[in-house]
Amino acid sequence: MSEAVPTSARKSKNAPVAPGPAPVLEIESLDMEARGVGRTVTEDGTPGKVIFVEGALPGERVTYSSYRRKPSYEQATVVDILRPSVLRTQPKCAFFGTCGGCSMQHLDMRAQVAIKQRVLEDNLWHLAKLRAETVFAPIHGPSWGYRYRARLTVRNVAKKGGVLVGFHEKKSSYVADMTSCEVLPPHVSAMLVPLRRLVEGLSIRDRMPQIELAVGSQVTALVLRVLEPINADDEALLRAFADEHKVQFWLQPKGPDTVTPFYPLDVPLDYTLPEFGIRMPFKPTDFTQVNHQINRVLVGRALRLLAPSRDDRVLDLFCGIGNFTLPLARLSREVMGIEGSDTLTTRALANARENGVDGHTTFACRNLFEVTGDDLRALGAFDKFLIDPPREGALAVSKALAEIAQSGEGPLPKRIVYVSCNPSTLARDAGLLVHEAGYRLKGAGVVNMFPNTSHVESIALFERG
């Protein structure tokens, strides 16, 4: 809220008001959304409001314009950079700053990884009073062309000259007018404009709100969300586009369970884990990692940390389609995968059979957000756990392990590898595992699964004894 202006100082309502100079701010750090963070200083020299400035980097001196004001903080955008950071780089994408797909292209990649590591360490310390005994070397790979999964929004916008296909604009429901994308694989980026033209020619151009993208090892799948049936002319256009661009179309008339392949029908969608001789078939609506190259390294790192042997019984929680379960089955006596989705559980079992490891695997569908100590006891003894939860984390699992440890009734795994996509829920769960279940945080490090974004993926190792 702006301050009241004394009556004597008020101008005529018709008189022009010259804007004052933009305020100046020293940027001290970045927050979880890749915004520069600084603090104003009051007239008496005491700290004032915290200012979150989009587009600013640590060490920079900037002027800014606030678009949201609260009593203790403001949100703002950069007006001018008076002293640039040595870590500032030229964004590769012409649409950076407008498109909401990326938030850190203006920051050197090594600095991006270092900042994500600091975010991980800060969360562990501030939320759980923990420091890892070892900081793992970051897992990183290609910075561009890595995004093998994406949800593209489709809008027929007359003011923009036709159909738009792309990510949302930053902090907006509008679709970015983008004709290429540096984080999508090059062949997908090159398809954005042809996709516009394709949709413009369809009878349901106003009834197709999104296209789901999933790139496999042999084919790129495009799932069209269709709110009305397509006609014969539409079918012909889709087939011609698929043949020209070597893609596979799927149609989704309602929920995810209604997704069916349209054309071509004979090309399998899969990804591979060559280190373990695994080929992983999946449907384009299944959860798979966005970055295939990083996923391969991550699976290898996780298994080396877990160090399974032929005598070990391993529990893989939130197993999905078997991304960790199947490689673990190559090295363990037995692996049990538990997943909350019936569909993914069925897919994991089929993938185990496909790869010839069904003799070493079992799968079950359970709600892991409501699991108890008694539920874990009923599963029997496991030597090691691998936990790979969604952003909500594994709170119920962590509480169940703490309950078993404090009761002294029931076996506990001697080692846990926890793969996280949210540092705050990892820190929360780590606090339970260490302070209440008796584990040590042996190591933790970041996984740069999403370069040029503020998303922080990480991996942590816990041991008892």
UniProtKB/Swiss-Prot annotation:
* Organism taxonomic ancestry: Bacteria, Pseudomonadati, Pseudomonadota, Betaproteobacteria, Burkholderiales
Active site per UniProt: 421 (nucleophile)
- Function, as annotated: Catalyzes the formation of 5-methyl-uridine at position 1939 (m5U1939) in 23S rRNA.
- Supply the name of the protein: 23S rRNA (uracil(1939)-C(5))-methyltransferase RlmD
Q: Name one GO biological process term.
A: rRNA base methylation
Query: What PANTHER family does its record include?
Result: 23S RRNA (URACIL(1939)-C(5))-METHYLTRANSFERASE RLMD, RNA M5U METHYLTRANSFERASE
Its gene?
A: rlmD
Q: Does the keyword Methyltransferase apply?
A: yes
Family note: Belongs to the class I-like SAM-binding methyltransferase superfamily. RNA M5U methyltransferase family. RlmD subfamily.
Q: Which SUPFAM superfamilies does its entry note?
A: Nucleic acid-binding proteins (SSF50249), S-adenosyl-L-methionine-dependent methyltransferases (SSF53335)
Taking every annotated instance into account, which residue ranges of this chain make up the domain TRAM?
16-80
NCBIfam families, sorted: PRK13168.1 (NF009639)
One Pfam family here: tRNA_U5-meth_tr
Positions bound to [4Fe-4S] cluster: 93, 99, 102, 181
Q: Which GO-annotated molecular functions does the record name?
A: 4 iron, 4 sulfur cluster binding; iron ion binding; RNA binding; rRNA (uridine-C5-)-methyltransferase activity
